[in-house]
Curated annotation (Swiss-Prot):
Its EC number is 2.5.1.78. GO terms for cellular component: cytosol; riboflavin synthase complex. The gene is ribH. One of its GO terms (biological process) is riboflavin biosynthetic process. This is 6,7-dimethyl-8-ribityllumazine synthase. It catalyses: (2S)-2-hydroxy-3-oxobutyl phosphate + 5-amino-6-(D-ribitylamino)uracil = 6,7-dimethyl-8-(1-D-ribityl)lumazine + phosphate + 2 H2O + H(+).
Amino acid sequence: MIYTGKLTGHEERRIAIVVSRFNALVTEPLLKGARDTLNMHGVDEHHISVFWVPGALEITMVSSQLAESGMFDGIVTLGAVIKGDTDHYNLVINGVANGVSQVSLSTNTPIVFGVLTTDTLEQAQQRAGAKAGNKGAEVTVSLLEILSLYDDIKQLS
């Protein structure tokens, strides 16, 4: 058998979106892309919960609480970390990426990583709905596909 994630059958999914307020000029369009994608694929608006956090580092903490609660089928994480002149950029992005991955694996909750890492604000804006598409929408499609595959795997056992 060959299995591939489907973008249908998600009407009853409960989805959490954890989004950073820092760099809101970028994260607000990412959030819009994620919500529009969920709506387009039939997820009931009442089943979408948005959790604003101060910055990218807080994404992991809140995602962990949400995953452990068992209230959500999947989680979308959104943020924008723009490189500066210090090593802070590397510390933040490595911490968030590793943390989100660990939470997903330890709780068996699908969590997709939509935290942009760019050199400039302009690059981030391009990836948040301008010329380079909307990464919030893209990672949300990935989440729906993964949730569908999880369903397929459960049916195998």
